[in-house]
Amino acid sequence: MSTTAAPEVELVETETPMGELALRVAVRGCRSVAAHQYHRGALRILRPHYLDDSGQVCYVVVNPGGAYLGADLYVIDVEVGDGAKLLLTTQSATKIYRTPGSFAEQRVCLRLGEGAQLELAPDQLIAYREASYRQNTRITVRPSSSLVMAEVVTPGWSPDGASFRYEELRLRNEIQVETPGGTGLLALDNLLIRPPLNDVTGMGFMEGYSHLGSLVVVDARVEQALADEFHALTAGHDACTGVSLTASVGGTTGLVLRSLSNSTEELNRLLGACTALLRERWYGQSPLNLRKY
């Protein structure tokens, strides 16, 4: 296993990341293993483990510092090789504290090979009072790749009890499909919340809710029938949910689910129900149970 090369995410000459992490997963025998890994600064990964006999490897990302602060830059680069299977999660919530002077930022690059499976299941992102955070995720898939990415965003505690005391949250996902004929844009998902500039609590935005859940699925098996199933599946939860599909590019399609609630636990249950359906139907795996707490 190589441990020398840094991440491939682009940096300008003056930028020094607070933490860097690179991971490449490949198939060895009947299991997926790390063919290369690298870390520097305030990012680590724990030893791999396997939750079932599917061969999917699970890695846990750790930030020993415990939080993101002003002007912090974190860089994560992950490649899942042809036929490999990776579950990537975090040890705990990502906490964004006050960021005076400049925003905290995380840049993520994900690349999936043919037949590769990537499941992203991080703990919630918590933005505290006077926090500004930007997350830019660039994803490249192949037509036979399978991507499932879940995320929950919550406001942190504030002395006055108000929910939206952070300055800015900007979460951008760009998904490209690479085919023999070239690369095409499948989806550009840009979430921007600026509480000081807009009333984000009302109609057309957070609709009176405080927590946001997102699920992004990219797979050749995505179709309208799946979106309809998700609509029915989420109806029994205490949340306001919408599901949409992208156009097909290179034979694969994307699904985006957005859900609003006042509870992290409720959103985790909702997203967990959706991912459990996919895990059983597509991969023959049981519902995800990471048993962190």
From Swiss-Prot:
Superkingdom assignment: Bacteria
Residue ranges crossing the lipid bilayer per the database entry: none
Any single GO CC term annotated in Swiss-Prot or TrEMBL for this entry: cytoplasm
Principal subcellular localization: cytoplasm
GO MF annotation: an example: nickel cation binding
Cysteine-cysteine disulfides: none
Localization of this protein: Cytoplasm
Keyword annotations: Chaperone, Cytoplasm, Nickel insertion
InterPro entries linked to this entry: UreD (IPR002669)
Subunit comment: UreD, UreF and UreG form a complex that acts as a GTP-hydrolysis-dependent molecular chaperone, activating the urease apoprotein by helping to assemble the nickel containing metallocenter of UreC. The UreE protein probably delivers the nickel.
Family, similarity comment: Belongs to the UreD family.
HAMAP family xref list: UreD (MF_01384)
Role, per record: Required for maturation of urease via the functional incorporation of the urease nickel metallocenter.
Protein name: Urease accessory protein UreD
Organism per entry: Arthrobacter sp. (strain FB24)
